[in-house]
Amino acid sequence: MSEMAKRLLEQRANVWEQAKGLLDAAAAENRDLTAEEEASYAKMTSDLESIRSHADKLIADEETARAAEESL
């Protein structure tokens, strides 16, 4: 796995921890998310999907390139 793919997966893990922290904080206070928190959480989940998609594509491209090199 390339360094770029590793960085993307690390970034995704960091965003997930932030999102989880937001949910955990609201749960600890026995309340729903505020409108601002809800917007932040929605942005984080969108970022999670985008980062994961980018990482998956990068990894697939690396595997394709590796297979092409091996077939030569």
Kindly label every feature range from the protein language model.
Residues 1-72:
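Intrinsically disordered, low-complexity terminal tails
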